[in-house]
Amino acid sequence: MSESTATPVEITTRPEPGRILLKAPRRGKPPKHLADFDLAGRKEFLTELGHPGFRASQLSTHYFDHLTTDPQRMTDLPAATREEMVAAAMPQLLTEVRTLEADGGDTIKSVYRLFDGALVESVLMRYEHRVTMCISSQAGCGMNCPFCATGQAGLTRNLSTAEIVEQVVAGARRLKSMQGLEQAEHGTEATRPLRVSNIVFMGMGEALANYKAAIGAI
């Protein structure tokens, strides 16, 4: 695999041998994000931020369909308030710090730093007839499986719903970018899937130990 730069962060909350850790350590919570809520919750969230609730549908279209958080591209929002609205409703949750590529670029692992310095991983896998995303539900893991490096490292904290969703959105953005580059290089229309078709919770963490956030992301 080829790789870019990395800044590792140690995860130190590790269960005793033979024990599992189901309750995540107490840590600060990430900022609230549009993706933490269902549509009704997003409308309430926007209202609390001082904006009309109907803006939630517009922001949802930009984020989930257009995969953008760039306020300059959101021309259906008021120019005077769109930057402040986007910054408050869709704060940056993930910062990519490392990538690993295999299979000629068809498999890409991304390592992201969260707001508190914790690290999580996701993997984008492209096949002829599908695109699969492997995502994390926790930073670290408390299951303490002896065969798993993540489990042996310990559990830092649960991810929020939006932090889980953001991994998929980031993967979808990367897929879209890769397809554009391939089309420009070869001058042909894409022949492989254009969207993420499968999502598996097989990254870091045990999704059932972070049930509420995992279900919210689904």
Model region roles, listed by residue range:
Residues 1-131:
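Flexible, acidic/Gly-rich N-terminal and inter-domain linker regions that tether
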Residues 120, 125-136, 142-218:
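Conserved Radical SAM active-site core
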Residues 38-41, 75-78, 101-104, 139, ...:
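Solvent-exposed, flexible loop/coil residues
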